[in-house]
Amino acid sequence: MVSERSSKEKKRSRARSEDSSSSDYEEKVKRHRGTEKDDERRSRRSDKKDKKSHKHHKSSTSKKSKDDKPKKKHTESDHKLKEGIPELSMEDYFSKNNEFATWLKEEKRTYFNDLTTEAARGLFSRFVKRWNRGKLESRYYEGISTAPRTAHDWMIKRR
C-alpha cells in the first residue's frame, strides 16, 4: 500500500509540475509576444543595421599622394614676428599682463578688473594670436611699464 500511495503521489506531483512548467512557458511567451508596433520597430532596426553594414570604402587603387593635400591658407611666413620678439603662449598670462591690460582698455574698451577669470583668459588668447601674427602696435612689443587696471580715479596727490 505504501508503494501504491507513493507512486500515485509521484504521478500527481509530476502532473502538477508539468502543469506549472507549461503555464510558466505560456507566461513567458505572453510577456515576450509584442504588438505589431514592436515588430515594426524590430524590422526597422534590422533595416538600419543592413544599411550600415553595406557601406563601402574607397578602393585602395585611388590612394592620394602627398601632393594632393589641400594647401594651407596661411603659411608660417605670414605669422613671423620681427627679430628678437618672442612668440607668446597662454603661459605668458602674467608676464605680459601690462601689455594685455593696455590692449584691453584701448581695443576692447574694458578694464582688466571688470573681467571674470574665464573672460580674461579668453581675451588673452585673442591677444596672444594678434601678438604672434604681428598685428599689434610696436609699443606693445617694446614693453609697457604700467597699465590701466580700473576705471576708478584714485585722486592721489602728485608732487
Swiss-Prot record:
Comp. bias regions, Basic residues: 51-63
UniProt keyword list: Auxin signaling pathway, Cell cycle, Cell division, Developmental protein, Nucleus
GO CC terms in record: nucleus
Locations listed in the record: Nucleus
Top-level division of the source organism's lineage: Eukaryota
Disordered: annotated segments: 1-86
Presence of the UniProt keyword Cell division in the record: yes
InterPro entries on file: SCI-1-like (IPR044688)
Ranges annotated as biased composition (Basic and acidic residues): 15-50, 64-85
GO BP of this protein: auxin-activated signaling pathway; cell division; cellular response to auxin stimulus; gynoecium development; negative regulation of cell division; regulation of auxin mediated signaling pathway; stigma development; style development
Disruption phenotype: Increased cell number in upper pistils leading to enhanced stigmatic structure. Impaired siliques formation. Reduced expression of auxin-related genes.
The keyword DNA-binding is annotated on this UniProt entry: no
Task of the protein: Component of the auxin signaling transduction pathway that regulates cell proliferation and differentiation during flowers stigmas and styles development. Involved in the regulation of auxin-related genes.
PANTHER family per the UniProt record, alphabetical: STYLE CELL-CYCLE INHIBITOR 1
Protein known as: Style cell-cycle inhibitor 1
